């Protein structure tokens, strides 16, 4: 699996329109929208991006062209019930822009522990499941300093999301914080966006780019349908020890959480 150098792909927004792909990526809530904005800004190919949020002011700041305002636009106040209700009230627009007949695979990315991502992501997943769309959740859980209440909400949200996704990849913000060393917490958030982007990009590249073993969408769907919890590591290497370095990097990847697969 190859990893593009995301830092070299800064984009001028007026000169790129992403393709209308069978693969959709939707960011739900503040954290999810930030991650999808990062993917869009870095020209990740092979998928179509959508952002949705209950906060209309935050939504306007996104560079992603396709936007869905959930509910009245006044935010969810860190209340997952508000996020859920806002998504339920916006089902028609979600169906039209996200779950149309051109969509075969959907990534739902969200930061769990707040109101919109925690409450709305499971609603969107259930809608996708009802349409037979291969659905993958890529979500984060909070930093320790965000408190027990946020973590409790995140766990409840992941439990609800798991009911309706084929596969879920959970990224631990705390591990990203420790993995990259002496970062301030606010400096770790862009790294979270990068890790989320790497996860989505890795899977879309398997489908869209030729490799040593030919894999198409049907192969990925057969493998991921109903597969449950997912693990993914990403590493790269150069020079004489490139294979060893890539494997070592993949095993140390923040995407693996605390799982020991050595």
Label the predicted regions:
Residues 1-262:
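Tubulin/FtsZ superfamily GTPase core signature
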């Amino acid at each position: 699996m190859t990893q593009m150098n995301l830092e070299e792909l800064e984009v001028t927004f007026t000169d790129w329109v992403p393709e209308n792909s069978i693969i959709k990526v939707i960011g739900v809530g503040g954290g999810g929208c930030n991650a999808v904005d990062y993917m869009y800004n870095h020209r990740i190919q092979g998928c179509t991006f959508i952002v949705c949020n209950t906060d209309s002011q935050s939504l306007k700041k996104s560079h992603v062209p396709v936007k869905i305002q959930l509910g009245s636009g006044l935010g969810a106040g860190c209340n997952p019930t508000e996020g859920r209700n806002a998504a339920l009230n916006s089902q028609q627009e979600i169906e039209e822009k996200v779950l149309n007949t051109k969509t075969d695979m959907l990534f739902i990315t969200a930061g769990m522990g707040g109101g919109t991502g925690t409450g709305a992501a499971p609603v969107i997943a259930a809608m996708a499941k009802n349409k037979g769309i291969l659905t993958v959740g890529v979500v984060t859980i909070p930093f320790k300093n965000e408190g027990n209440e946020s973590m409790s909400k995140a766990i409840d949200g992941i439990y609800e999301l798991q009911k309706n996704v084929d596969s879920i990849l959970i990224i631990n913000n705390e591990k990203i914080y420790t993995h990259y060393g002496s970062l301030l917490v606010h400096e770790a958030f862009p790294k979270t966006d990068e890790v989320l982007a790497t996860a989505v990009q890795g899977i879309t590249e398997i489908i869209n780019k030729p490799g040593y073993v030919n894999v198409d969408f049907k192969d990925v769907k057969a493998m991921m349908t109903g597969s449950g919890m997912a693990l993914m590591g990403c590493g790269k290497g150069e020079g004489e020890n490139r294979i060893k370095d890539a494997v070592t990097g993949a095993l140390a990847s923040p995407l693996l959480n605390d799982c020991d697969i050595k």
